[in-house]
Amino acid sequence: AFGLKEADITAALEACKAADSFNHKAFFAKVGMSAKSAGDVKKAFEIIDEDKSGFIEEEELKLFLQNFKAGARALTDAETKIFLKAGDADGDGKIGIDEFAALVKA
């Protein structure tokens, strides 16, 4: 997925397997997304933005891990809200492409 190594994805998912253990910074670093080009980050955004609205909404964030591996757990409500708050720089309740890119590189 996203041109990432399968072993890195597996390790990153394993590290946040327990409920409420997801940390976006640690996850992006572990899967190798932090080092990806702007083009690759945009491709990832477009996949996560399932309804193609140009934004990643709360419901799409909740299923974030499943974009990396089918059958991965959904994020808890608490994790989803923390993730959304971290990425939603303008406070509109959703994450745009620029906000997502900043979140990945943070």
Curated annotation (Swiss-Prot):
Binding-site residues, Ca(2+) 1: 49, 51, 53, 55, 57, 60
Alphabetized GO MF terms: calcium ion binding
EF-hand domain span: 36-71, 75-106
Record's keyword terms, sorted: Acetylation, Calcium, Metal-binding, Muscle protein, Repeat
Record InterPro entries: EF-hand-dom_pair, EF_Hand_1_Ca_BS, EF_hand_dom, Parvalbumin
Residues at which Ca(2+) 2 binds: 88, 90, 92, 94, 99
PROSITE patterns recorded: EF_HAND_1 (PS00018), EF_HAND_2 (PS50222)
Pfam family, any one: EF-hand_7
N-acetylalanine modification, residue list: 1
Cellular component, GO annotation: cytoplasm
Highest taxon listed in the record's lineage: Eukaryota
Similarity remark: Belongs to the parvalbumin family.
Job of this protein: In muscle, parvalbumin is thought to be involved in relaxation after contraction. It binds two calcium ions.
Protein name as it appears in the record: Parvalbumin beta
Organism: Squalius cephalus
